[in-house]
């Protein structure tokens, strides 16, 4: 848990900094036309590195690889990714960043981690909501789940406070909301509201994912 928390918090701070300083042309369009940004690559590199440093035999199944990043027309993106990662790990080279990204594997064993370095890249690009999602799976069961939301208000009733919160679930021990940069936490539970009229519903912030005629 300590390593996972450290990794996802560090990746969150990385993403917050990148978003604050984000420049035009800081994303690549993949074959499926979905965007991938400096933050996607850097977040994956950071988390894969920290997990593999602590658990060298563990597999990480993640979304990106460095193939697009290494293309001549994307070398500026690679330089930017390396620069931001270098701020966290001084002395880091572009080759090392690519090797950390490529620690991701497409094969799995009884124990493996699964990572989405940025879930909601479009939201990230427009300064809206996105998440960093990490889970540990053993023998087909999720043992640990983490979701960092760097741009989400920790308390919707107090929007003047700084943004960023973290959600942690541990098998057999419950679920918690935590501070992104602190030790404060509160236990989460399923709502006791049974009347759907009184219930709160949530849906994707992306219109294409929230078509009420389909979903």
Task: Locate each region found by the language model.
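N-terminal subdomain of lithium-sensitive/metallo-dependent phosphomonoesterases centered on the IMPase/IPPase/PAP
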Residues: 1-118, 152-153, 180, 200, ...
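Short, conserved acidic/polar surface loops in the N-terminal third of protein domains
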Residues: 71-74, 125-127, 157
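Acidic beta-strand-loop-alpha-helix segment within the catalytic core
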Residues: 131-215
């Amino acid at each position: 848990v300590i390593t996972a928390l450290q990794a996802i918090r560090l990746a969150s701070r990385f993403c917050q900094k990148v978003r604050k300083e984000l420049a035009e042309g800081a994303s690549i369009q993949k074959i499926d036309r979905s965007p991938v940004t400096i933050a996607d690559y850097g977040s994956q590199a950071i988390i894969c590195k920290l997990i593999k440093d602590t658990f060298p035999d563990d597999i990480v199944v993640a979304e990106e690889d460095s193939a697009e990043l290494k293309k001549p027309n994307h070398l500026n993106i690679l330089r930017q990714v390396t620069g931001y990662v270098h701020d966290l790990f001084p002395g880091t080279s572009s080759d090392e960043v690519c090797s950390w990204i490529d620690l991701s594997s497409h094969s799995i064993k009884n124990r493996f981690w699964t990572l989405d370095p940025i879930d909601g890249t479009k939201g990230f690009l427009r300064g809206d909501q996105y998440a960093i999602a990490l889970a540990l799976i053993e023998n087909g069961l999720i043992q640990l789940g983490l979701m960092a939301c760097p741009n989400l208000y920790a308390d919707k009733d107090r929007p003047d406070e700084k943004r960023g919160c973290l959600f942690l679930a541990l098998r057999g021990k419950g679920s918690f909301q935590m501070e992104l940069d602190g030790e404060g936490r509160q236990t989460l539970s399923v709502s006791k509201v049974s009347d759907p009229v009184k219930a709160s519903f949530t849906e994707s912030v992306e219109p294409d994912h929230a078509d009420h005629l389909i979903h």
